[in-house]
C-alpha cells in the first residue's frame, strides 16, 4: 500500500502570529492537549484564540494559560469556562528539558499553532526569549529593506 505524505494529514486551526514578532524562537515541540468534549468540537470549528497565551511547568506537568476557546453553540450545560487552564500532554523527559529552559532568565513557553494531526488536536509549543523594542524595530527595518530590494529587482528585470 502507498505511504501517505505526513504533511497531507495536518490541518492548521489557529496560529499565534504575534509570537514571531514578540519573541526569538529557540526550540519547538509538539504536545497533545487535554480538552473536554464541547471544547474539541469548538476547536475543530476554528473557534480558538492563542493571543496572549503561554505555558508554564508546574509540579512536573505543563499547563496552557489564557487560551480562549469559544463555547460550543450546541453545548448548553456541557460548556466549560472558555479561559480555563488546560493540561498539555508531554513525556517526562520533554517536560524536564522544557523546565530547564524556563528556569533560565528571560525564557518562556508560548504556543505557536494548534492543528489537527491524524484526528488528534496538537499544540506546537515554543521555547522563546522576549525581544526588546530595538530588536522589533530592527526586524521591521530588515523586512522593509528586503521588500524594497525585491521591488527594485522586479522593476529592473522588466
Swiss-Prot record:
It is found in: Cytoplasm. GO terms for molecular function: RNA binding. Its main location: cytoplasm. GO terms for biological process: trans-translation. It comes from the Bacteria. Required for rescue of stalled ribosomes mediated by trans-translation. Binds to transfer-messenger RNA (tmRNA), required for stable association of tmRNA with ribosomes. tmRNA and SmpB together mimic tRNA shape, replacing the anticodon stem-loop with SmpB. tmRNA is encoded by the ssrA gene; the 2 termini fold to resemble tRNA(Ala) and it encodes a 'tag peptide', a short internal open reading frame. During trans-translation Ala-aminoacylated tmRNA acts like a tRNA, entering the A-site of stalled ribosomes, displacing the stalled mRNA. Belongs to the SmpB family. This is SsrA-binding protein. It comes from Caldicellulosiruptor saccharolyticus (strain ATCC 43494 / DSM 8903 / Tp8T 6331). The gene is smpB.
Amino acid at each position: 500500500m502507498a505511504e501517505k505524505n505526513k504533511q497531507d494529514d495536518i490541518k492548521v486551526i489557529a496560529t499565534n502570529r504575534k509570537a514571531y514578532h514578540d519573541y526569538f524562537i529557540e526550540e519547538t515541540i509538539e504536545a497533545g492537549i487535554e480538552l473536554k468534549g464541547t471544547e474539541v468540537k469548538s476547536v475543530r470549528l476554528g473557534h480558538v484564540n492563542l493571543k496572549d497565551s503561554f505555558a508554564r511547568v508546574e509540579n512536573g506537568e505543563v499547563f496552557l494559560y489564557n487560551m480562549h476557546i469559544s463555547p460550543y453553540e450546541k453545548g448548553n450545560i456541557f460548556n466549560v469556562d472558555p479561559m480555563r487552564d488546560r493540561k498539555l500532554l508531554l513525556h517526562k523527559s520533554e517536560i524536564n528539558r522544557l523546565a530547564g529552559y524556563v528556569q533560565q532568565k528571560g525564557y518562556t513557553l508560548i504556543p505557536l499553532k494548534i492543528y489537527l494531526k491524524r484526528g488528534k488536536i496538537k499544540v506546537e509549543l515554543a521555547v522563546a526569549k522576549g525581544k526588546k523594542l530595538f530588536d522589533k524595530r530592527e526586524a521591521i527595518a530588515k523586512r522593509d529593506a528586503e521588500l524594497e530590494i525585491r521591488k527594485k529587482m522586479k522593476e529592473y528585470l522588466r
